[in-house]
């Protein structure tokens, strides 16, 4: 179903992992669905119980959540690796990140709340000659040009596999390809 959210015209899809992300998305969604140029909002939620972080989100982080993604664990400049995760698999992504930084210091953990918003913004930038200003491009900018990305979600891996096209990073897309 993440691919439906990614490809359906007039539908903005989100898959938050944490309740504070959901709150930021709700605020935006209520304005969006009532706007003259707005549209429908699809929230892909899970019944899986997740430990919730205790944090106060900055206005910048709330905006990034609505724009489609933010760094839960920012990479160091020139980092060799980033885990890119969406939805309830964040628990496994956090655990993997904690193990990986022992061997690959500086690796980042990127949370994707809306693959579609990230992709739409990036494609618009590519088509208008300003792809470097796309939110996803700015998110990936700290990584080494040779960095690898491991994408993970509980949906089809192609939902996030396109991240490799943004800055020509290698991608290992993980997810559910058959069910």
Regions found by a protein language model. Give the residues of each.
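Structural signal for short hydrophobic segments within the conserved structured cores
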Residues: 12-14, 172
């Amino acid at each position: 179903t993440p691919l439906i959210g990614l490809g359906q015209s007039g539908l903005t899809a989100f898959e938050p992992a944490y309740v504070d992300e959901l709150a930021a998305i709700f605020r935006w969604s209520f304005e969006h669905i009532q706007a003259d140029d707005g549209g429908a909002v699809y929230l892909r939620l899970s019944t899986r119980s997740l430990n919730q972080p205790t944090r106060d989100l900055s206005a910048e982080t709330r905006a990034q959540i609505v724009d489609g993604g933010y760094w839960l664990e920012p990479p160091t400049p020139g980092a060799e690796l980033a885990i890119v995760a969406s939805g309830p698999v964040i628990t496994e992504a956090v655990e993997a990140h904690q193990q990986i930084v022992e061997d690959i210091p500086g690796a980042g953990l990127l949370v994707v709340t809306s693959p579609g918003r990230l992709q739409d913004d990036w494609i618009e930038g590519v088509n208008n000659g300003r792809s470097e200003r796309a939110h996803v491009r700015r998110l990936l900018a700290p990584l080494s040009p040779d960095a690898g990305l491991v994408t993970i979600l509980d949906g089809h891996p192609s939902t996030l596999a396109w991240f490799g096209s943004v800055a020509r990073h290698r991608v290992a897309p993980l997810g559910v390809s058959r069910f």
